[in-house]
Amino acid sequence: DVYKRQVVNWAPVIREGMHVDPLTIMSKAVLEGTGHDCEIARVVARKNDIKLNTPTGGVIGERSLNVELGESTTVENTKEIYPGLFVSGMAANGVSGSFRMGPIFGGMLMSGKKAAELICAKLDK
């Protein structure tokens, strides 16, 4: 079966301490939006020994708080970091080694909009 437009929320599994075997999901595009920890990008890079579209080829990690730069770089760092893997929001800054916090004045919304546009453009090809 093919299911379209799905979101997987793992939070209840973690919260309840449930043991769940790994889920296998096939997708043309994945949006990494796990926030500061950028968990999806970290796991994908580590387990597959791949290079990400970052200056170091890996997850760089966040820098200290800078409201002004954090706001703008959140949108700038929203991109495809590996074929089919897109990053947005604070995960975008974490992956790219930019500043934490700050994007509270629209940067998060603009990052999400940019991610959606990038994904739609890729899927339309």
Task: List each model region and its residues.
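Solvent-exposed alpha-helices and their adjacent loops that cap or buttress functional pockets
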Residues: G17-M18, P22-I25, T74-I81
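Short hydrophobic core segments
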Residues: T24-G35
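Glycine-rich beta-alpha-beta "Rossmann" dinucleotide-binding loop(s) and their flanking helix/strand
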Residues: V20, H36-E62
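Short, small-residue-biased leader/transition segments that mark boundaries at the very start
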Residues: V2-Y3
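A conserved FAD-binding loop/helix module that cradles the flavin
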Residues: V95-L123
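Short FAD-binding loop at a beta-strand-to-alpha-helix junction that anchors the flavin cofactor
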Residues: K79-F99
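Glycine-rich phosphate/nucleotide-binding loop
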Residues: T56-K79
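Short glycine-/small-residue-rich Rossmann-like dinucleotide-binding loops
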Residues: W10-P12, G35-H36
